[in-house]
């Protein structure tokens, strides 16, 4: 009894502090790299920097179970342009380096599953860990293990994670405020070690002026069963200050709890932004119109959210969240990389309402007009959500989003080999279903899910310099845009003093800043004027030529109609074509793709499109938001490239081509200063 009380006292004294509220400045431990050749260059007109703020490495439980053994440090090396080889022997390298990067492993069970895989560790000796033992060693890494890993990920992981510890663990959890201390399959030391590894990698790879490495992680949560709708966020820290332990769903599973925690640690010196992703798969949860407890949204909610969550991922590997054909039936380009199922629930439909950013923009304007604030005044970024430590943005060099999807066969884009199809067909029907065996067009494929993934996306930030501080402030003010993986350069401005400007003016950008506002900002229309918009896009030198520029207008009609509305305007066409004044559409420029070799039209499209535009339907009494969408000429989708290399016909149900694109953050035009 005395020993028990002594142990209890030690636990109380050593573990009573909430580590999520203990902030440390890690710059004091790790030397910041500076060298003469990396002198920081500042551009008052701002330069565009491309990067990825959503990357999973071997420390994420799901990435590890899918074969990822690549460390956070190696992930940053990849972002800098170095060659990295994954556990399946796939050689991964970017065509050109990125400017910034954040490893964002799941805070949930970060660094713990590889302990389950080690039979010599304390956790590896627990009952139920045997199927995980040596899972990423030797012969266990072959393609045939894919179906086994799916079961481990979707079933065994949850059962093991739910096992409770004894009384001592429960007492420790009470005093530490970390309920995971009461979980048998959790080890706080392993968890903190992985978190520290992520911080150390970011600090050591951060090179101000040359390459920015952000400290970050993913807050992973969802609604209770049976809905189980996910609303995950990545948390990106401004500098070197971060908590001793990441705040996870076990600390609070609702986003209001996350935002409140962000407020608390900001007061302690650790500023951060949360960026939600896969709203398309959230079953209406990311942009719901109420608190998590059912109360209606009010201005306090809107302020809390916008203070902590000014951005959203508009595209990534698991689909695009701009809009859905059901929400935008008049938008011919709405059906782009749509993934209709819930995150992690491949057979359950995700309700488009409350799941897409265009509708959210309109709902935010409606809430604002009702005096409840605008919780959806959001800017856009793209990201990869790679679980391979290394994102694959290039359609012609796509190597999957996880280590085990490194082969075309495992991605489902080419038929299974005869031997593998025979093996899977010999399994019981339920095992065949779990393994994803699918017979289509007289051929056998490994499921449908892999082909629904996209080679997407990237975040673009307009910033004075390539440093944490400058990039973070740009993200805070929403001067950002997202792309589907290409590096289109895109400017978007609005102002009332652009009448004397022309698209060919010298110092056009400086004048646009001086006389108006950039993407992500508010334009207050005190004099009821019709603003002019400046849109300027340049093609990715490694991508296809540009086909058209579009402005999407979103507004709320607060008259007797009380309805949200949207309209797509083409504002600039390639190849000397003109926008039809009635349909507001460019004629087809005739660009095509040769599906025998994926070559594209060389004489169609533009290297650059630049124009001024005014809304022909402008009504000064209605608040509206406007954002730009840039479309490239069509190119082969990655799945078509896979089939072409394998010498087989592409799958009939998978799109053969895509139009890569970019989306600017919106500009909000308000009739008064209440914005």
What is each PLM-predicted segment?
Residues 1-7:
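Sec-dependent signal peptide recognition
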Residues 13-15:
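C-terminal motif of bacterial Sec signal peptides marking the signal peptidase cleavage site
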Residues 17-72, 76-135, 184-187, 198-209, ...:
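C-terminal functional module detector
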Residues 128-174, 576-589, 597:
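Low-complexity, serine/threonine/proline-enriched polar segments
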Residues 238-239, 557:
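Short acidic-glycine loop/turn motifs at beta-strand connectors
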Residues 181, 185-192, 204-207, 220-225, ...:
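A conserved hydrophobic secondary-structure block that centers on an alpha-helix together
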Residues 257:
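Acidic, metal/ion-coordinating pockets
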Residues 107-108, 145-212:
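Long, well-ordered early-domain segments
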